Amino acid sequence: MANFKVLVVEDSPTMRQLIVFALKRVRGIDITEAQDGVDGLKKLSADHYDLILTDINMPIMDGLKLVSLVRNDPSYKTVPIVIITTEGASEDRERALAIGANEYITKPIQTSRIIDTAKRLLGIAP
């Protein structure tokens, strides 16, 4: 089975652990963690990832700015990006999708939703 590299960008250690816990249940995924958008950009410049999961509300650089910058990088134009956030308003969702996010998941999250979304976006059979 191919190994997919997944970047999880989340400032809350508890939420980051929950997302990582869910992803570890999927075979063939290598996970890298970042604590904010700036840290995420550093990781993205050092390696290539097959999937990015990011929060919106983070210090230093928020997730929407991260998505916008990532989408302007030709090597990441088609890499799936999942927003995971407490922002549940439809205009927040529309804005995130408009700047390039592929999925928008609101907290509280179910680990099964993270797993199913990652598998689908990476093309891993259920």
Annotated model-derived regions:
Residues E10:
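Conserved acidic carboxylate
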Residues E33-L51:
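Acidic, metal-coordinating helix/loop segments flanking the phosphotransfer/catalytic sites
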Residues M58-M61:
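Receiver (REC) domain active-site loop signature in two-component systems and cognate sites
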Residues I109-A118:
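C-terminal output helix
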